[in-house]
Amino acid sequence: MKLCGGIDLHSNNSVVALLDEQDRVVYRQRLANDAPRVLEALAPYREGIVGLVVESTYNWYWLVDALMDAGYRVHLANTAAIVQYSGLKYSDDDSDARWLAKLLRLGLLPEGYIYPKEQRAVRDLLRRRSRLVQQHTANVLAVQNLLARNRGQSLNANAVKRLTPEAVARLLPNPNLALAVQSTLLAMRGQEAAIELLEREALAQVRGRAPYRHLLSVSGIGPVLGLTILLETGPVERFGQVGQYASYSRCVGSAHLSNGKRKGHGNTKSGNKYLAWAYVEAANFAVRYNPTIKRYYQRKRAKTNGIVAIKTVAHKLARACYWMLREGTEFAVNRAFA
């Protein structure tokens, strides 16, 4: 008897459901989020299980890793692409788990990519760095806003980063205001050290790879953007076509058209936000420093606007990087922006 399993994963528990080939429930149980307990519950049905579906929630790593290490065939459900019948009168965790298992049995499951565990940890270093950069920027803005409120004028970001306790005391004679700025500066110093540490460690593990060196040949891509693109892309072979990669990088439109008219738009958040950021950043740098790309950008901007033109350049760079990673070649600006 072949069994398909669905696991509705939550923060502290999971609902496991196993269905046979006639969609009959063979096993259903709510289990604590404990890998040995989940494996123990599945053990009696191991020989019949042909696949297990896990929701791609924020905490799926531990469960997918444990199931794969135990030899199960695991599928990661792309929850953003799974749509249940909107007229359902009632649904709960049990029905969600059964629905995942049924989609797998029917071959209709929208799947997410399970990034290899070893490489995933390096990629997450870059994601942590990105979060720290955002927090650091928020602290810079907080200092600028405080100075503007209390002095009528502010400082640029570089001047804020160079502030010393003595300079803060001169700018803000009020000790409470000075302490507020100094405490923010202390947090910024810690963030800067952590950002440098994460970047250095990720670079040490990736620097020797040929695909990384090829990415650095692209106009606008430096060490951080190269790391981000390489690690967020993963094995480029998982994208069957260049258009799929461009879509995953959020570099394509999402308009719904009918009879030449716009009827709405699709899911603009579908894809990888880190790749989307990296390619837009690379596009801005490329336009600034590469004459060929700058001319292309100016032609597009004359027909549309700056935002659309930059996104078009980002799309071109994403397509170029796809072929570079796939073929192991370096960047050729005349091919990408002919």
What are these regions (language model features)?
Residues 126-214:
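Glycine-rich, often acidic, oxyanion-interacting loops/wings at catalytic, nucleic-acid
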Residues 12-36:
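Short glycine-rich, Thr/Ser-proximal phosphate-binding strand/loop in the N-terminal lobe
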Residues 75-127, 131, 166-169, 261-270, ...:
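Short alpha-helix plus adjacent loop in nuclease-associated cores
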Residues 1-20, 100, 132:
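Gly/Thr-rich phosphate-binding beta-strand-loop-beta motif of the actin/hexokinase/Hsp70
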Residues 35-51:
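Short, basic/hydrophobic alpha-helical segments
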Residues 260-261, 297-338:
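Low-complexity, acidic/Ser/Thr- and charged residue-rich accessory regions of DNA metabolism proteins
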Residues 49-56, 100:
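Acidic beta-strand-to-loop metal/phosphate-binding motif
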